[in-house]
Amino acid sequence: ASGSFAGRRGLRLSKVEAQIPDLTHTVVAVNADARGPLPELLALMTTSPLGEMTGNALAQATGAGSANLQLHLSLPINDLRQSKVQGSVTLAGNELRITPDTPALDRLRGVLQFSDTGFSLTNVQAQALGGPLRLDGGMRALAANAPATESAVQLRAQGTATAEGLQQATQLGLLSRLAQRAKGSAPYT
């Protein structure tokens, strides 16, 4: 089947499949693919139960370009609070800003895997701060006895920043102003 999400006409659903594999334990399994503008996909992720299930990790994100979504849901009819989500967003040259105070990621390529327990990035590539960037890592559930200093989000960014790129990243405040007098580039991790 195919269709669209209510209120998200730019997102086109395809390969939609719903099934109940076992009638004695009523769990609806839903699989679907979607394609459309990244801003609509981000809005869907933050305004639907997907936002809560993924810890609202993209609540402030903005973006441009088209993206693909693959979605797998497991919905126990008798207790929807126990629902499971798994999916991926494929980016192919998009622009993304995670929060208003972070630099834009341009020409973003890669796959963001997500589930009800977190998300992961593997070899995601972009342009940021005037140079190439590679991102790996993600967010995972912490053990109940984890120290308060341990973060659920662990990302590794490796790239090159240029003086011009830092100058243009006005959301970085003082660093951007200091870069007005700089030249060249430097690697970072």
Sequence positions of predicted segments:
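Solvent-exposed loop/turn segments connecting transmembrane beta-strands
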Residues: 8-10, 99-102, 128-132
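Extended amphipathic, helix-rich lipid-handling scaffolds
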Residues: 1, 23-80, 84, 88-92, ...
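Short "repeat-start/strand-capping" segments in structured domains, especially the N-termini
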Residues: 25, 105-107
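Surface loops and adjacent helix of pleckstrin homology
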Residues: 2, 16, 23, 101, ...
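Membrane-embedded beta-strand positions in outer-membrane beta-barrel channels/transporters
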Residues: 15, 68-70, 109
